[in-house]
Amino acid sequence: MALVRPFPIVQVVGFQNSGKTTFIERILEKASEQGVHLGCLKHHGHGGEPQTLTEGKDTDRYKAAGADVTAVEGAGVLQLTARRNWDLARLIELYQFLETDCLLIEGFKKAPYPKVVILSEKEDLEALQAVNIIAIIYRKKEHMTEHQGLPVFHADDPVAVDFVLSQLKGESA
């Protein structure tokens, strides 16, 4: 029987323009420095299809002509487009297949994975209705203290990045 390797997942959730992408960039930079092979998945929650990466290129033409899956590879980089009804479980399987060590997900607010919530305003926490929160990151200058036993960090605090990385590496924070 094959052993299933652990595959830590952490979600970063928050409202639009709350700073999710900037925070994720900081995590990715530090993970890269530490040799962690971190996958990153973003949910396009704004309606419609995401913008194409290959506008007007051959793979875009293949897609327009009816291909369900197109890809282009060069210098070890693969760009893949697949027209399917993707559920999160299937996307996670894809990242595992690609042999990443762990996965950082932006969005998919209702998914059951451990979440770091990015807040512009304290009131956003209740409005998000997120479950399985492991930490809160706030952006305002005013100091926010612990919330219901959860660790709370300012967005500029490097310890916030360390906390998320420890979760992704399967370490206790």
UniProtKB/Swiss-Prot annotation:
Keyword set, alphabetical order: GTP-binding, Molybdenum cofactor biosynthesis, Nucleotide-binding
A GO BP entry: Mo-molybdopterin cofactor biosynthetic process
Gene3D superfamilies named in the record: P-loop containing nucleotide triphosphate hydrolases
SUPFAM superfamilies: P-loop containing nucleoside triphosphate hydrolases
This protein's record includes keyword GTP-binding: yes
Any Pfam family the entry gives: MobB
Highest rank taxon of the organism: Bacteria
Record-stated family: Belongs to the MobB family.
Entry function: GTP-binding protein that is not required for the biosynthesis of Mo-molybdopterin guanine dinucleotide (Mo-MGD) cofactor, and not necessary for the formation of active molybdoenzymes using this form of molybdenum cofactor. May act as an adapter protein to achieve the efficient biosynthesis and utilization of MGD. Displays a weak intrinsic GTPase activity.
Protein name: Probable molybdopterin-guanine dinucleotide biosynthesis adapter protein
Biological source species: Bacillus subtilis (strain 168)
